[in-house]
Protein backbone atom coordinates (compact mmCIF):
# COMPACT_ATOMS: atom_id res chain seq x y z
CA UNK A 1 0.00 0.00 0.00
CA UNK A 2 1.20 3.47 -0.83
CA UNK A 3 0.89 5.98 2.01
CA UNK A 4 0.98 9.72 2.61
CA UNK A 5 0.62 11.80 5.79
CA UNK A 6 -1.23 15.12 6.05
CA UNK A 7 0.00 17.46 8.78
CA UNK A 8 0.09 21.14 9.67
CA UNK A 9 1.74 23.75 11.84
CA UNK A 10 -1.06 23.67 14.43
CA UNK A 11 -4.50 22.44 15.40
CA UNK A 12 -7.42 24.26 13.80
CA UNK A 13 -5.82 24.36 10.36
CA UNK A 14 -8.58 22.37 8.68
CA UNK A 15 -6.73 19.03 8.70
CA UNK A 16 -9.68 16.82 9.47
CA UNK A 17 -12.06 18.19 6.86
CA UNK A 18 -9.46 18.53 4.10
CA UNK A 19 -8.02 15.08 4.85
CA UNK A 20 -11.52 13.58 4.74
CA UNK A 21 -12.26 15.45 1.51
CA UNK A 22 -9.08 14.12 -0.11
CA UNK A 23 -9.92 10.60 1.06
CA UNK A 24 -13.37 10.83 -0.47
CA UNK A 25 -12.11 12.29 -3.73
CA UNK A 26 -9.39 9.64 -4.12
CA UNK A 27 -11.90 6.90 -3.25
CA UNK A 28 -13.55 7.46 -6.62
CA UNK A 29 -10.44 6.00 -8.25
CA UNK A 30 -8.63 4.03 -5.53
CA UNK A 31 -9.34 1.88 -2.50
CA UNK A 32 -8.43 4.22 0.37
CA UNK A 33 -7.76 3.39 4.03
CA UNK A 34 -7.78 6.21 6.58
CA UNK A 35 -5.42 6.35 9.56
CA UNK A 36 -5.26 8.81 12.46
CA UNK A 37 -2.13 9.79 14.36
CA UNK A 38 -2.66 9.77 18.11
CA UNK A 39 -5.48 8.61 20.38
CA UNK A 40 -8.40 10.58 18.91
CA UNK A 41 -11.78 8.82 18.71
CA UNK A 42 -13.67 11.43 16.71
CA UNK A 43 -11.65 12.13 13.56
CA UNK A 44 -11.69 8.45 12.46
CA UNK A 45 -15.46 8.72 12.16
CA UNK A 46 -15.04 11.38 9.49
CA UNK A 47 -12.54 9.18 7.68
CA UNK A 48 -15.01 6.30 7.66
CA UNK A 49 -17.68 8.47 6.07
CA UNK A 50 -15.17 9.57 3.44
CA UNK A 51 -13.84 6.11 2.52
CA UNK A 52 -16.50 3.65 3.60
CA UNK A 53 -13.92 1.77 5.70
CA UNK A 54 -12.99 2.02 9.41
CA UNK A 55 -10.06 4.32 10.14
CA UNK A 56 -7.20 3.03 12.27
CA UNK A 57 -5.37 4.86 15.06
CA UNK A 58 -1.57 4.91 15.07
CA UNK A 59 -0.33 6.04 18.48
CA UNK A 60 3.34 5.73 19.36
CA UNK A 61 2.80 6.33 23.09
CA UNK A 62 0.19 3.63 23.60
CA UNK A 63 1.23 1.14 20.93
CA UNK A 64 5.00 1.50 20.51
CA UNK A 65 6.89 1.74 17.22
CA UNK A 66 6.62 -1.90 16.13
CA UNK A 67 2.90 -2.16 16.80
CA UNK A 68 2.30 1.07 14.90
CA UNK A 69 4.15 -0.35 11.89
CA UNK A 70 2.29 -3.66 12.20
CA UNK A 71 -1.07 -1.90 12.30
CA UNK A 72 -0.20 0.23 9.29
CA UNK A 73 0.90 -2.85 7.33
CA UNK A 74 -1.98 -5.05 8.52
CA UNK A 75 -4.74 -2.58 7.77
CA UNK A 76 -3.12 -1.47 4.54
CA UNK A 77 -3.35 -4.90 2.96
CA UNK A 78 -5.57 -4.91 -0.13
CA UNK A 79 -5.73 -1.09 -0.19
CA UNK A 80 -4.23 1.16 -2.86
CA UNK A 81 -3.33 4.06 -0.59
CA UNK A 82 -3.36 4.87 3.10
CA UNK A 83 -3.89 8.48 4.14
CA UNK A 84 -2.71 9.34 7.64
CA UNK A 85 -4.10 12.43 9.34
CA UNK A 86 -1.63 13.99 11.77
CA UNK A 87 -2.40 15.44 15.18
CA UNK A 88 -1.81 19.02 16.38
CA UNK A 89 1.26 20.60 14.75
CA UNK A 90 3.87 18.48 13.00
CA UNK A 91 6.38 18.49 15.87
CA UNK A 92 3.91 18.61 18.80
CA UNK A 93 3.31 15.86 21.35
CA UNK A 94 4.56 14.76 24.77
CA UNK A 95 7.82 15.57 23.05
CA UNK A 96 8.90 15.03 19.45
CA UNK A 97 9.28 11.29 20.20
CA UNK A 98 5.48 10.98 20.14
CA UNK A 99 4.70 13.59 17.48
CA UNK A 100 3.36 13.38 13.95
CA UNK A 101 6.91 14.02 12.79
CA UNK A 102 8.12 10.90 14.63
CA UNK A 103 5.25 8.86 13.21
CA UNK A 104 6.23 9.91 9.69
CA UNK A 105 9.84 8.96 10.42
CA UNK A 106 8.99 5.57 11.94
CA UNK A 107 6.63 4.65 9.11
CA UNK A 108 8.79 6.15 6.33
CA UNK A 109 5.86 8.24 5.15
CA UNK A 110 6.19 11.49 3.16
CA UNK A 111 4.34 14.54 4.43
CA UNK A 112 1.98 17.01 2.81
CA UNK A 113 1.32 20.17 4.83
CA UNK A 114 -2.07 21.85 5.19
CA UNK A 115 -1.58 25.52 6.09
CA UNK A 116 -4.37 27.90 7.08
CA UNK A 117 -3.61 31.05 5.08
CA UNK A 118 -6.35 33.28 6.45
CA UNK A 119 -4.86 36.69 7.31
CA UNK A 120 -1.41 35.83 5.92
CA UNK A 121 0.19 35.81 2.50
CA UNK A 122 3.91 35.61 1.84
CA UNK A 123 4.50 34.65 5.48
CA UNK A 124 3.34 31.16 4.57
CA UNK A 125 6.71 30.71 2.88
CA UNK A 126 8.49 31.16 6.20
CA UNK A 127 6.11 28.73 7.92
CA UNK A 128 6.66 26.03 5.32
CA UNK A 129 10.43 26.55 5.28
CA UNK A 130 10.59 26.38 9.07
CA UNK A 131 8.63 23.12 9.16
CA UNK A 132 10.71 21.59 6.37
CA UNK A 133 14.14 22.44 7.77
CA UNK A 134 13.47 22.15 11.52
CA UNK A 135 14.34 18.48 11.06
CA UNK A 136 16.05 16.94 8.07
CA UNK A 137 15.14 13.27 8.51
CA UNK A 138 11.59 13.34 7.11
CA UNK A 139 10.33 14.25 3.68
CA UNK A 140 7.93 17.19 3.37
CA UNK A 141 6.88 16.86 -0.25
CA UNK A 142 3.93 19.19 -0.73
CA UNK A 143 1.67 21.87 0.72
CA UNK A 144 -2.02 22.66 0.38
CA UNK A 145 -3.28 26.11 1.34
CA UNK A 146 -6.55 26.46 3.24
CA UNK A 147 -8.92 29.45 3.40
CA UNK A 148 -7.62 31.20 0.30
CA UNK A 149 -9.63 34.37 -0.32
CA UNK A 150 -8.88 34.94 -4.01
CA UNK A 151 -6.65 33.99 -6.90
CA UNK A 152 -4.40 36.93 -6.00
CA UNK A 153 -4.13 35.65 -2.42
CA UNK A 154 -3.24 32.20 -3.74
CA UNK A 155 -0.50 33.60 -5.97
CA UNK A 156 1.09 35.51 -3.07
CA UNK A 157 1.17 32.32 -1.01
CA UNK A 158 2.33 30.09 -3.85
CA UNK A 159 5.17 32.40 -4.90
CA UNK A 160 6.48 32.55 -1.32
CA UNK A 161 7.03 28.80 -1.00
CA UNK A 162 10.38 27.30 -1.98
CA UNK A 163 11.59 23.67 -2.12
CA UNK A 164 8.10 22.27 -1.47
CA UNK A 165 5.58 21.66 -4.24
CA UNK A 166 2.33 23.60 -3.97
CA UNK A 167 -0.51 21.17 -4.68
CA UNK A 168 -3.37 23.66 -4.71
CA UNK A 169 -5.74 25.18 -2.23
CA UNK A 170 -9.15 25.12 -0.62
CA UNK A 171 -10.98 28.45 -0.95
CA UNK A 172 -12.39 30.32 2.01
CA UNK A 173 -16.00 29.23 2.43
CA UNK A 174 -18.09 29.88 5.50
CA UNK A 175 -19.88 26.59 4.89
CA UNK A 176 -16.64 24.63 5.42
CA UNK A 177 -16.76 24.36 9.17
CA UNK A 178 -17.03 21.41 11.53
CA UNK A 179 -18.65 22.44 14.77
CA UNK A 180 -16.88 21.76 18.05
CA UNK A 181 -17.98 20.65 21.49
CA UNK A 182 -16.24 20.33 24.82
CA UNK A 183 -14.35 17.15 23.82
CA UNK A 184 -13.44 18.38 20.34
CA UNK A 185 -15.27 17.97 17.05
CA UNK A 186 -18.85 16.77 17.15
CA UNK A 187 -19.10 13.05 16.56
CA UNK A 188 -20.47 11.62 13.34
CA UNK A 189 -23.30 10.06 15.33
CA UNK A 190 -24.35 13.51 16.54
CA UNK A 191 -24.18 15.36 13.22
CA UNK A 192 -25.79 13.88 10.11
CA UNK A 193 -24.76 16.99 8.17
CA UNK A 194 -21.16 15.75 8.25
CA UNK A 195 -21.75 13.57 5.19
CA UNK A 196 -22.91 16.55 3.14
CA UNK A 197 -20.03 18.65 4.45
CA UNK A 198 -17.42 16.09 3.41
CA UNK A 199 -19.11 15.69 0.03
CA UNK A 200 -19.05 19.45 -0.55
CA UNK A 201 -15.42 19.76 0.58
CA UNK A 202 -14.39 16.90 -1.69
CA UNK A 203 -15.92 18.68 -4.67
CA UNK A 204 -13.76 21.71 -3.91
CA UNK A 205 -10.69 19.53 -3.46
CA UNK A 206 -11.29 17.87 -6.83
CA UNK A 207 -11.47 21.31 -8.43
CA UNK A 208 -8.54 23.06 -6.74
CA UNK A 209 -6.08 20.36 -5.55
CA UNK A 210 -3.81 18.12 -7.65
CA UNK A 211 -5.02 14.71 -6.48
CA UNK A 212 -2.93 12.79 -8.99
CA UNK A 213 0.20 14.41 -7.58
CA UNK A 214 -0.80 13.40 -4.04
CA UNK A 215 -1.08 9.78 -5.14
CA UNK A 216 2.23 10.05 -6.98
CA UNK A 217 3.97 11.47 -3.89
CA UNK A 218 2.78 8.62 -1.66
CA UNK A 219 5.44 6.08 -0.68
CA UNK A 220 5.32 2.30 -0.79
CA UNK A 221 8.68 1.81 0.94
CA UNK A 222 8.90 -1.47 2.88
CA UNK A 223 8.02 -1.07 6.57
CA UNK A 224 10.38 -3.95 7.42
CA UNK A 225 7.97 -5.56 9.86
CA UNK A 226 6.70 -9.13 10.06
CA UNK A 227 2.96 -9.60 10.32
CA UNK A 228 1.98 -12.45 12.67
CA UNK A 229 -0.78 -14.76 11.56
CA UNK A 230 -4.19 -13.99 12.98
CA UNK A 231 -4.64 -16.02 16.14
CA UNK A 232 -8.38 -16.32 15.85
CA UNK A 233 -9.85 -18.97 18.09
CA UNK A 234 -10.85 -22.16 16.29
CA UNK A 235 -13.16 -23.26 19.05
CA UNK A 236 -16.55 -22.03 20.19
CA UNK A 237 -16.28 -18.35 20.99
CA UNK A 238 -17.69 -16.89 24.16
CA UNK A 239 -20.03 -13.93 23.85
CA UNK A 240 -18.91 -10.41 24.75
CA UNK A 241 -21.48 -7.64 25.08
CA UNK A 242 -20.29 -4.19 24.00
CA UNK A 243 -22.20 -0.99 24.73
CA UNK A 244 -22.57 1.03 21.55
CA UNK A 245 -24.81 4.02 20.90
CA UNK A 246 -24.43 7.84 20.85
CA UNK A 247 -23.58 7.81 24.57
CA UNK A 248 -20.87 5.13 24.24
CA UNK A 249 -19.06 5.25 20.91
CA UNK A 250 -15.36 5.67 21.76
CA UNK A 251 -13.76 2.42 20.62
CA UNK A 252 -10.60 1.78 18.64
CA UNK A 253 -11.36 -0.36 15.60
CA UNK A 254 -8.25 -2.43 16.26
CA UNK A 255 -9.42 -3.14 19.82
CA UNK A 256 -12.68 -4.52 18.47
CA UNK A 257 -10.81 -6.60 15.91
CA UNK A 258 -8.52 -8.02 18.61
CA UNK A 259 -11.55 -8.98 20.69
CA UNK A 260 -13.20 -10.58 17.64
CA UNK A 261 -10.36 -13.10 17.59
CA UNK A 262 -11.57 -14.52 20.89
CA UNK A 263 -15.19 -13.50 21.25
CA UNK A 264 -18.47 -13.30 19.45
CA UNK A 265 -19.26 -9.60 19.82
CA UNK A 266 -22.84 -8.48 20.40
CA UNK A 267 -23.61 -4.78 20.71
CA UNK A 268 -26.25 -3.33 23.00
CA UNK A 269 -27.57 0.17 23.62
CA UNK A 270 -27.96 1.45 27.18
CA UNK A 271 -29.88 4.41 25.72
CA UNK A 272 -32.44 1.92 24.40
CA UNK A 273 -32.47 -0.01 27.68
CA UNK A 274 -30.97 -3.11 26.05
CA UNK A 275 -28.96 -5.99 27.51
CA UNK A 276 -27.35 -9.25 26.41
CA UNK A 277 -28.61 -11.95 28.71
CA UNK A 278 -26.03 -14.66 27.98
CA UNK A 279 -22.92 -12.47 27.82
CA UNK A 280 -19.77 -13.87 29.42
CA UNK A 281 -17.88 -10.55 29.33
CA UNK A 282 -18.92 -6.91 28.98
CA UNK A 283 -17.07 -3.87 27.61
CA UNK A 284 -18.35 -0.31 28.04
CA UNK A 285 -16.31 2.34 26.26
CA UNK A 286 -16.26 6.09 26.51
CA UNK A 287 -18.38 8.68 24.78
CA UNK A 288 -20.85 11.34 25.83
CA UNK A 289 -23.01 10.00 28.68
CA UNK A 290 -23.30 13.56 30.01
CA UNK A 291 -25.42 14.46 26.96
CA UNK A 292 -27.90 11.64 27.61
CA UNK A 293 -28.41 11.74 31.37
CA UNK A 294 -32.20 11.44 31.35
CA UNK A 295 -32.20 8.45 29.00
CA UNK A 296 -29.44 6.70 30.94
CA UNK A 297 -31.23 7.29 34.22
CA UNK A 298 -34.29 5.61 32.74
CA UNK A 299 -32.31 2.61 31.43
CA UNK A 300 -33.44 0.53 34.39
CA UNK A 301 -33.26 -2.88 32.68
CA UNK A 302 -29.71 -2.28 31.45
CA UNK A 303 -28.56 -1.01 34.85
CA UNK A 304 -30.15 -3.92 36.71
CA UNK A 305 -28.59 -6.41 34.28
CA UNK A 306 -25.12 -4.85 34.67
CA UNK A 307 -25.39 -4.85 38.45
CA UNK A 308 -26.48 -8.49 38.51
CA UNK A 309 -23.68 -9.48 36.13
CA UNK A 310 -21.14 -7.67 38.28
CA UNK A 311 -22.37 -9.37 41.45
CA UNK A 312 -22.18 -12.72 39.63
CA UNK A 313 -18.49 -12.14 38.91
CA UNK A 314 -18.79 -11.62 35.16
CA UNK A 315 -15.80 -9.69 33.82
CA UNK A 316 -16.81 -6.12 33.04
CA UNK A 317 -14.35 -3.55 31.72
CA UNK A 318 -15.32 0.12 31.42
CA UNK A 319 -13.45 3.22 30.27
CA UNK A 320 -14.22 6.87 31.02
CA UNK A 321 -17.88 7.24 30.00
CA UNK A 322 -18.33 3.61 31.00
CA UNK A 323 -16.89 4.43 34.43
CA UNK A 324 -19.43 7.25 34.71
CA UNK A 325 -22.31 4.93 33.84
CA UNK A 326 -21.24 2.33 36.41
CA UNK A 327 -21.01 4.98 39.13
CA UNK A 328 -23.75 5.85 41.59
CA UNK A 329 -24.77 9.33 40.48
CA UNK A 330 -23.93 11.79 37.73
CA UNK A 331 -24.48 15.42 38.63
CA UNK A 332 -25.23 17.82 35.79
CA UNK A 333 -24.33 21.51 35.42
CA UNK A 334 -27.52 22.45 37.29
CA UNK A 335 -26.46 20.26 40.25
CA UNK A 336 -29.24 17.78 39.52
CA UNK A 337 -28.52 14.15 40.44
CA UNK A 338 -29.05 11.43 37.85
CA UNK A 339 -29.00 7.89 39.18
CA UNK A 340 -26.72 5.50 37.30
CA UNK A 341 -25.87 1.80 37.74
CA UNK A 342 -24.38 2.06 41.22
CA UNK A 343 -21.79 -0.69 40.93
CA UNK A 344 -19.30 1.82 42.32
CA UNK A 345 -20.07 4.20 45.18
CA UNK A 346 -18.84 7.21 43.24
CA UNK A 347 -20.58 10.48 42.41
CA UNK A 348 -19.30 12.37 39.38
CA UNK A 349 -19.85 15.95 38.29
CA UNK A 350 -20.40 15.76 34.55
CA UNK A 351 -18.90 19.09 33.47
CA UNK A 352 -15.70 20.45 34.93
CA UNK A 353 -12.28 21.40 33.57
CA UNK A 354 -10.97 19.43 30.61
CA UNK A 355 -8.62 16.60 31.52
CA UNK A 356 -6.65 15.46 28.50
CA UNK A 357 -3.29 13.77 28.10
CA UNK A 358 -1.39 10.53 28.03
CA UNK A 359 -1.26 8.24 31.04
CA UNK A 360 1.05 5.58 32.39
CA UNK A 361 -0.40 3.05 34.79
CA UNK A 362 1.25 0.47 37.03
CA UNK A 363 -0.86 -2.54 37.96
CA UNK A 364 -0.63 -2.82 41.74
CA UNK A 365 -3.30 -5.52 42.15
CA UNK A 366 -4.19 -8.63 40.22
CA UNK A 367 -6.84 -8.03 37.57
CA UNK A 368 -7.92 -9.41 34.20
CA UNK A 369 -6.58 -6.47 32.17
CA UNK A 370 -2.89 -6.16 33.07
CA UNK A 371 -0.62 -8.51 34.99
CA UNK A 372 0.37 -7.22 38.41
CA UNK A 373 3.53 -5.04 38.43
CA UNK A 374 3.31 -4.44 34.68
CA UNK A 375 3.07 -0.93 33.26
CA UNK A 376 0.69 0.10 30.50
CA UNK A 377 0.16 3.38 28.70
CA UNK A 378 -3.15 5.00 27.81
CA UNK A 379 -4.77 8.41 27.63
CA UNK A 380 -7.38 10.49 29.47
CA UNK A 381 -9.99 12.62 27.72
CA UNK A 382 -12.91 13.97 29.75
CA UNK A 383 -14.52 16.99 31.38
CA UNK A 384 -16.07 15.13 34.32
CA UNK A 385 -14.76 15.04 37.88
CA UNK A 386 -15.42 12.65 40.78
CA UNK A 387 -16.66 14.59 43.79
CA UNK A 388 -17.35 11.65 46.11
CA UNK A 389 -15.40 8.40 46.00
CA UNK A 390 -16.22 5.75 48.60
CA UNK A 391 -14.23 2.92 47.07
CA UNK A 392 -11.05 1.38 48.45
CA UNK A 393 -9.87 -1.02 45.76
CA UNK A 394 -7.98 0.29 42.72
CA UNK A 395 -5.86 -1.83 40.42
CA UNK A 396 -3.71 0.95 38.92
CA UNK A 397 -1.27 3.42 40.40
CA UNK A 398 -1.04 6.41 38.06
CA UNK A 399 2.57 7.22 37.21
CA UNK A 400 1.62 9.79 34.57
CA UNK A 401 -1.81 11.42 34.44
CA UNK A 402 -4.61 12.02 36.96
CA UNK A 403 -6.78 8.92 37.24
CA UNK A 404 -9.90 8.82 39.39
CA UNK A 405 -8.56 10.06 42.72
CA UNK A 406 -5.22 10.42 44.51
CA UNK A 407 -3.25 9.17 41.47
CA UNK A 408 -5.25 5.93 41.42
CA UNK A 409 -7.26 4.49 38.53
CA UNK A 410 -9.04 1.27 37.69
CA UNK A 411 -11.59 1.05 40.47
CA UNK A 412 -12.50 -2.60 41.11
CA UNK A 413 -15.53 -4.42 42.48
CA UNK A 414 -15.84 -8.19 42.08
CA UNK A 415 -14.64 -8.72 38.49
CA UNK A 416 -15.64 -5.24 37.32
CA UNK A 417 -12.85 -2.77 36.53
CA UNK A 418 -13.44 0.82 35.41
CA UNK A 419 -10.91 3.54 34.69
CA UNK A 420 -10.64 7.02 33.25
CA UNK A 421 -7.78 5.86 31.03
CA UNK A 422 -8.49 4.55 27.55
CA UNK A 423 -6.19 1.67 26.56
CA UNK A 424 -5.09 0.29 23.21
CA UNK A 425 -5.18 -3.50 23.22
CA UNK A 426 -2.21 -3.94 20.90
CA UNK A 427 0.06 -3.00 23.81
CA UNK A 428 2.12 -6.09 24.61
CA UNK A 429 1.66 -5.58 28.36
CA UNK A 430 -2.10 -6.06 28.14
CA UNK A 431 -3.66 -9.48 28.52
CA UNK A 432 -7.10 -9.02 27.07
CA UNK A 433 -8.51 -12.33 28.18
CA UNK A 434 -11.70 -11.18 29.87
Curated annotation (Swiss-Prot):
Pathway in which the depicted protein is active: Cofactor biosynthesis; adenosylcobalamin biosynthesis; cob(II)yrinate a,c-diamide from sirohydrochlorin (anaerobic route): step 10/10
Protein's name according to its UniProt entry: Cobyrinate a,c-diamide synthase
Functional summary from the UniProt entry: Catalyzes the ATP-dependent amidation of the two carboxylate groups at positions a and c of cobyrinate, using either L-glutamine or ammonia as the nitrogen source.
Domain GATase cobBQ-type, chain residue ranges per copy: 239-430
PANTHER family in UniProt: COBYRINATE A,C-DIAMIDE SYNTHASE (PTHR43873:SF1)
Misc: The a and c carboxylates of cobyrinate are activated for nucleophilic attack via formation of a phosphorylated intermediate by ATP. CbiA catalyzes first the amidation of the c-carboxylate, and then that of the a-carboxylate.
Coiled coil regions, renumbered to chain: none
Domain writeup: Comprises of two domains. The C-terminal domain contains the binding site for glutamine and catalyzes the hydrolysis of this substrate to glutamate and ammonia. The N-terminal domain is anticipated to bind ATP and cobyrinate and catalyzes the ultimate synthesis of the diamide product. The ammonia produced via the glutaminase domain is probably translocated to the adjacent domain via a molecular tunnel, where it reacts with an activated intermediate.
Tree of life domain: Archaea
Transmembrane segments: none
EC number: 6.3.5.11
A Pfam family that the UniProt record links to this protein: CbiA
InterPro entries in the cross-refs: CbiA/CobB_synth, Class_I_gatase-like, CobQ/CobB/MinD/ParA_Nub-bd_dom, GATase_3, P-loop_NTPase
Family affiliation: Belongs to the CobB/CbiA family.
Amino acid sequence: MKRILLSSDRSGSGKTLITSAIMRALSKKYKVRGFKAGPDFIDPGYHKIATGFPSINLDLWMMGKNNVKRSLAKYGKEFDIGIIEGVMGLYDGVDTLYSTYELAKVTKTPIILIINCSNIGSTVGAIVKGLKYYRSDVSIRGVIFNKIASETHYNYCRNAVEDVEVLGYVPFDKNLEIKSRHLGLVTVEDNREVQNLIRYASELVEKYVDLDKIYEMASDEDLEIDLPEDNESNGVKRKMAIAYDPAFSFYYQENLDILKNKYELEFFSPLNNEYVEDAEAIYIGGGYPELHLNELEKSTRTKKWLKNMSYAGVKIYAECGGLMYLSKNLIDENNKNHSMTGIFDIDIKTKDKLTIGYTELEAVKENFIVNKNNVVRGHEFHVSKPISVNEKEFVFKVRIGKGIINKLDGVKSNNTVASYSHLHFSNFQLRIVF
